[in-house]
Design a protein with these regions (language model features):
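N-terminal flexible segment immediately upstream of the FAD-binding catalytic core
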Residues: 1-65, 81-112, 262-270, 313-335, ...
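C-terminal substrate-recognition/cap domain of FAD-linked oxidoreductases
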Residues: 20-38, 220, 226, 231, ...
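Feature of Fe-S/electron-transfer and energy-metabolism proteins
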Residues: 24-34, 52-55, 66-69, 83, ...
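FAD-binding subdomain of flavoenzyme oxidoreductases
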Residues: 103-110, 114-256, 467-468, 478-485
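Activity-critical C-terminal alpha-helical subdomain
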Residues: 420-485
Length: 485
């Protein structure tokens, strides 16, 4: 191996799946969120020293052993479908691209489980199951790109979660490589105090271990499916109907809502929304009787909440486009926003608060979301920005903090932490939960090798007291300057 390489043993292990090319490394400096380079440089060293692309669990373990011996920071990454820098390096180091850990899906019909490798995309996983008469229980709204391992390390709520629960509850067993390179079996649950459980990966964002295999509960492919698209006079009616249907039996497989602001944003991006009023998309699946009972519930909700059922063709189109929410970025150049976990009962209040903020700031803000658990929803509010203009971008960035303030007032919190949401740790979880998470991190990664700088504490620039003051000043400056910037 050439002497000039920083890590010759890794090059020998991986061959052309290891690179120190500046060009190739540069692609890993960002995720879905676009940040001006000068601002990114103030947060951390986002350019990895090298990129490793393992294909097997043994290669992952060997890489981690090497990194542990040298206290080399390792940032795990696959599709990087968030905008919080969960998978962006902060300390240079080694970027571990796990998208190559794919292979056949193994089905255990007796246990009704499937074993899958972490680089497998959720849409591919579900297609592999359906070819044999099975289906996943739930999947993320980014399923065409998001990987199994990535979602298991997030909070894990999405399409199907309302009916079947979060993905952590579907885990039977994991195989994972610890920070010291040890491959270990991780059961779905453990009675042993301090033991690592598969459910403990929820929200860990790649900071505890690297998942190398997962066994998940699956289901028989549904015999019937029914889609409904409803429109309502206001968000109070739309979210009221959503909460009513989510609490009724049978439980919908999918319950997605969008404020009229989202429809307006879609039009700006060149698309034609199904309606310009608040929308609610409901899907039932299962046996034909269950779907028929769901249809009956929808009819009652439409009558009770003064709604209107749109055509079956529009309902089918809405279902087919369920992964395309971010197409509104075409109104661009880009978008910023906030994703919150909110009580379903407060969705209308939240939407009203966001509408008032948009009017105050003179900026369109699109709001949409999904009811993902009994009484709870994930909600996204997005607004346009231009990262090529640093000052307007910085002023616009303050609105994300304002959106979270609206969520906090209505019992919400950020959904996901990464780097950009670390200023809100005190609102995102209790002091006891944060202390427990930090203790778990110290136990399983005492050298802080895996994904350093994420989840547990903010970087200096995002320290909460100064961050809050800075964002308030920027928001005020933006409000004053909106006519000329």
């Amino acid at each position: 191996m050439p002497d000039e390489l920083a890590h010759p043993p890794l090059a020998e292990l991986l061959g052309d799946r290891y690179t120190e090319s500046a060009f190739e490394r540069s692609f890993y400096r960002r995720d879905l969120g676009v940040v001006p380079p000068r601002l990114a440089a103030l947060i951390g060293d986002t350019l990895p020293q090298a990129v490793a692309r393992p294909r097997t669990a043994d290669e992952v373990a060997a890489i981690l052993r090497y990194a542990a011996e040298r206290r080399l920071a390792v940032t795990p990454r696959a599709a990087a479908t968030t905008a919080y820098w969960n998978a962006v390096p902060l300390a240079g180091g080694l970027l571990l691209d796990l998208s190559g850990l794919t292979g056949p899906v193994e089905i255990n019909e007796a246990r009704l489980t499937a074993t899958v490798l972490p680089g497998t995309r959720w849409a591919e996983f579900d297609r592999a199951l359906r070819r044999r008469g099975f289906a996943v229980l739930s999947y993320p709204t980014s399923a065409p790109a998001a990987t199994v391992g990535g979602w298991l390390c997030m909070e894990g709520y999405g399409i199907g979660s309302l009916k079947y629960g979060g993905v952590q509850g579907q885990l039977r067993e994991l195989e994972a490589a610890l920070a010291n390179g040890q491959l270990t079996r991780v059961p779905g649950a453990s009675e042993k105090p301090g033991a690592l459980r598969a459910t403990g990966f929820a929200g860990s964002e790649g900071t505890l271990a690297i998942i190398t295999r997962a066994e998940l509960v699956i289901r028989r492919a549904p015999a019937a499916i029914g889609h409904h698209l409803l429109t309502f006079p206001d968000m109070a009616a739309a979210t009221g109907a959503a909460a009513e249907l989510a609490a009724a039996r049978p439980t919908p497989f999918y319950a997605h809502f969008a404020a009229e602001s989202y429809s307006r944003f879609l039009r700006r991006a060149g698309f034609t929304p199904a309606a310009d009023s608040p929308l609610l998309a409901i899907t039932y699946d299962g046996d034909p009787d269950e779907v028929a009972r769901g249809d009956h519930n929808v009819g009652r909700a439409v009558a009770h909440w003064r709604g209107e059922a749109l055509s079956a063709a529009l309902a089918q189109r809405e279902w087919d486009e369920r992964f395309l929410a971010l197409r509104l970025k075409r109104a661009g150049p880009s978008v910023l926003g906030a994703e919150s976990w909110l009580p379903a009962a407060r969705l209308a209040d939240y939407a009203d608060g966001v509408a008032k903020l948009a009017a105050q700031q003179g900026l369109p803000i699109a709001t949409y979301g999904t009811i993902v658990a009994p009484g709870w929803a994930t909600v996204m509010s997005l607004y346009g920005c231009d990262e090529s203009r640093p000052l307007p971008y910085l002023l616009a960035l303050s609105l994300t903090k304002k959106l979270y303030d609206v969520a906090f007032r209505h019992g919400g919190r950020p959904y996901g932490i990464g780097v950009w949401n670390t200023p809100y740790l005190a609102q995102a979880m209790s002091a006891e939960e944060l202390a427990m998470r930090r203790a778990t991190k110290r136990t399983f990664d005492p050298a802080n090798i895996l994904n350093p700088g994420k989840v547990y504490a903010p970087p200096r620039l995002l320290w909460p007291p100064t961050f809050r003051l800075g964002m308030e000043l920027l928001a005020g400056a933006r409000r004053v300057s909106k006519g000329w910037l």
